[in-house]
Amino acid sequence: VLEDFKSKVGQHIEILELEQFGNSLFIDGEIQVATTDEHLYSSTFVGAGLNLNKNNERAAIIGGGDGGVARECISKNFNFIDWYELDSEVVDVCNKHLGDIGKKATEKNSVKCVWGDAFQSIKSIKDDTYDHIFVDLNDDQFCIDLAAKNMDSMIRILKPKGVITAQVGSQDKKPKQVDNWLNVFNHHFGNAKLSRVYIPSFDCSWNFSSSINH
């Protein structure tokens, strides 16, 4: 156990060194990311969006405290990346123990970190700002409801033909949850494309849903 504490926003954060998967982040008892296979998650996540729209001018990341999605956006040459993260302590602890994942994404000129409630923060963003929005929230019903409640706000800041992509959990373990996410996307966009990848540290396939703003 490398870290074990409760953050100021009330999340139970642990960094454990796992024999098979290296340093790994747990939040509230659930694994979020492991050093050895994080690239599978982030590359599939960002790739799912870019498969529907190649434009890489401007991206928003909502959540994603380990920095993997931000790093992947940098590697895909996005010019501007706004990273909205509630819990700066997650980012700090990941920079400290899982440094290779974020590769100091917070220090890159193309990345602007906005701390606090993302859905409050995006209220000040102009219409039609982003080519891509990546929603990397926890995979539970609370976050599905939160995203659904704020979907109109996200659509407002998404360019025409822009793409929103979310990690939606595992059809292997929680199929109803994935269906609930897909229902939200289909309701708001009329389209949803599911991508999946097997992640060994999660011991299951993981799903990402993308929708185009027609």
Label the model's feature ranges.
Residues 2, 12-14, 100, 109, ...:
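Short, well-ordered helical secondary-structure segments
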Residues 13, 32-33:
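Short, isolated positions in well-ordered beta-strands
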Residues 21, 33-183, 188, 202-204:
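The AdoMet/dcAdoMet-binding core of the Class I SAM-like
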Residues 1-24:
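N-terminal auxiliary segments of SAM/dcSAM-dependent transferases
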Residues 200-214:
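Core SAM-dependent methyltransferase catalytic element
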Residues 189-200:
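Conserved S-adenosyl-L-methionine
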Residues 28-29:
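Short strand-turn-strand beta-turns centered on an Asx-Gly dipeptide
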